[in-house]
Every structure is written in C-alpha cells, then in structure tokens.
C-alpha cells in the first residue's frame, strides 16, 4: 500500500486515516488514489469509520455500496467487528484496483458482500455466484487466534479472509472468458471434481504426503478451487508486502530500481523473486524480537509457477467480462 501525501500541509497520510495530524477531516478518492480535504464523505463514515469519498453527500462510497447485508447490530461487538471487516475490504479492493479490478473502467460484475455477525452458530465464509459471505466475528483477534490454533493454520487475518474469498469471485469472473478454463485446469486441475467430497476428505484425512512441494497451504491441496483462492490470495499478499516496503522508503539489493511499482511489473517471476527476498529478511527481523514470521510460508518451484499463472490472469483479466 502506498503512503499518501497530506492534501493540506506537510507530512504523510496513511490509508486508514480519517484526518490529518492537525485534525483536518480527509477522505480517500479511490479513483484518483489520493486524499481530499472535503466532502462528500461516505454515509458510513460516522457508523463504521469509512474514510472514502461518496458520489454525493449521504451516499455510500464505492466499497460500502458493495455490502448488501450488514451485521445485526443487536449481536455483541457486531459493529466494532464490522468496522474492522470493512476496513480490510477497502484495503483489498484498493489493491485490486491497481490492476483495474472493480473500478469504473472494469466492465464486469462487482462482488456483493454479505457481512454477517455470529450468534451461537458460526457463520461459514464463502463465495457463490458473485456473493461473498464474511463472518465479521473473525475481526475479533481472540476468536481469530482460537480458530487459527484449532485449525493449525500459520496465518489467519481478516485481510487474508478478504483476499481468499474475493479470489473465488475473481475466478468466477475469469471463468466467463473462453480462454481461461482450459489453461486453469492444466495448471490447477479440474475444478469439476466434487467439492463437498473433497473438503470432507481433507478435513478427515488431512493433506497428501509431500503437499508442500505443490501447494502453498494444506487447505490449497483440498480442491482446485481452494488451490486457486489460496494462490491468488498469496499473490496479493506478496505484491502488497513488496509495494508497502517500497512505499515506506525502504530498499533492497533485489529491488529493480528506486520507486519501482510492483503492480506495474509485468515479469511475475521477478516480482516473486523480490517479494521472497523481502519476506525472508522481514521474517528474520521479526525473530529478533521474538515475533511470528510476517510470511510463514515456503514458495516451492511449483507454487511459484502457480503464482506466475495467477499474476498473468489478474493483471489482464479485469478488461474481460
């Protein structure tokens, strides 16, 4: 993510800022990718702290307009959790906008979000036909850690959930193209394999032996749909980590040039090589403070080829249907 210029003075603005350091209200314009010191502000600004501009005063911004169902406010912590969930959604949508997904120039369908709070029964997250269902309860760090440990996952965050579920929607968009499915099946396998049976087998038997040689996560080994979603989410992780590193003014010997833009990079292998070197370095720094790795995953040769495949399609796919 970029670091933005203060529109009314010196200093920087961060992506989630509602105001400058001196208290001037600001809002983010996702089309121009800049902050403005004036309305119209999103109608959700006072409700969930949305800091995007709206087409007119009293209207929802581009991101909030995609939320069709909001959580039941009578459920404890629903609104604070929704606030964090929508912030993660805005972050991921802006990342994807760098490749023109879901912007006005994108002729295809937008995701529709169902943001649901949890009562006694957990809410299953997923995607069906352009509708992305998200459990806002996962924004609660205690619940997220509890579930991460129960599922033996090395990483579980709301941004991760957003990237994964939106990746399913991106696959659905790309599958409408005549040239996608054959190439996808050659790389990931046939997605027509029975999905419920595959997940049941995964949760009963676990991943196949040696899965790390072919998959980024054990869950990716369950079914081609999940392999795509995990791989696409990881491409977004790695690209945004690299972009944030550059935006922070840091540099690396692997970085092609000063001011290099990972989202403009056409050579996916170079992007992945740079990202891999950065996460290895940051993982090492985190360990110096006894912290968990920023990116606790291994990039096998086959996983890198899948990342290259996803990069190629996500960079050019938004101009299709």
PLM region descriptions:
Residues 1-64:
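N-terminal cysteine/histidine-rich coordination modules
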Residues 4, 11, 220-321:
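Pan-zinc metallopeptidase signature
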Residues 80-141:
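Auxiliary, metal-adjacent structural segments of Zn-dependent hydrolase domains
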Residues 142-162:
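Short pre-active-site segment immediately N-terminal to the catalytic Zn-binding motif
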Residues 156-177, 229:
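Active-site recognition of the HExxH zinc-binding catalytic motif
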Residues 172-242:
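Post-HExxH zinc-binding segment in Zn-dependent metallohydrolases
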């Amino acid at each position: 993510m970029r670091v933005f210029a203060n529109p009314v003075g010196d200093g920087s603005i961060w992506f989630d800022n509602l105001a400058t350091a001196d208290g001037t209200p600001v809002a983010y314009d996702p089309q121009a990718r800049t902050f403005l010191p004036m309305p119209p502000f999103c109608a959700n600004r006072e409700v969930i702290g949305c800091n995007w501009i709206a087409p007119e005063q009293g209207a929802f911004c581009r991101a909030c307009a995609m939320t069709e169902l909001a959580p039941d406010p009578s459920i404890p912590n629903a609104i604070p959790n929704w606030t964090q969930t929508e912030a993660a959604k805005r972050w991921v949508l802006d990342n994807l906008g760098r490749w023109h997904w879901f912007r006005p120039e994108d002729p295809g369908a937008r995701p529709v979000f169902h943001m649901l709070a949890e009562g006694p029964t957990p809410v299953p997250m997923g995607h069906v036909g352009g509708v992305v269902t998200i459990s806002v309860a996962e924004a609660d760090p205690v619940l997220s850690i509890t579930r991460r440990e129960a599922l033996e996952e090395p990483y579980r965050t709301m941004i991760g959930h957003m990237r994964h579920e939106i990746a399913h929607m991106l696959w659905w968009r790309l599958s409408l193209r005549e040239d996608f499915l054959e190439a996808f099946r050659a790389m990931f396998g046939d997605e027509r394999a029975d999905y419920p049976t595959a997940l049941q087998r995964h949760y009963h038997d676990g991943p196949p032996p040696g899965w790390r040689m072919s998959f980024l996560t054990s869950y990716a080994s369950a079914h081609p749909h999940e392999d795509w979603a995990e791989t696409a989410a990881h491409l977004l992780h790695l690209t945004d980590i690299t972009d944030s590193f550059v935006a922070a003014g840091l540099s690396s010997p692997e970085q092609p040039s000063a001011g290099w833009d990972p989202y403009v990079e056409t050579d996916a292998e170079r992007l992945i090589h740079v990202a891999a070197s950065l996460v290895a370095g940051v993982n090492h720094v985190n360990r110096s403070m006894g912290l968990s790795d920023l990116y606790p995953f291994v990039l096998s040769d086959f996983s890198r080829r899948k990342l290259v495949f996803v990069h190629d399609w996500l960079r050019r796919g938004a101009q299709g249907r």
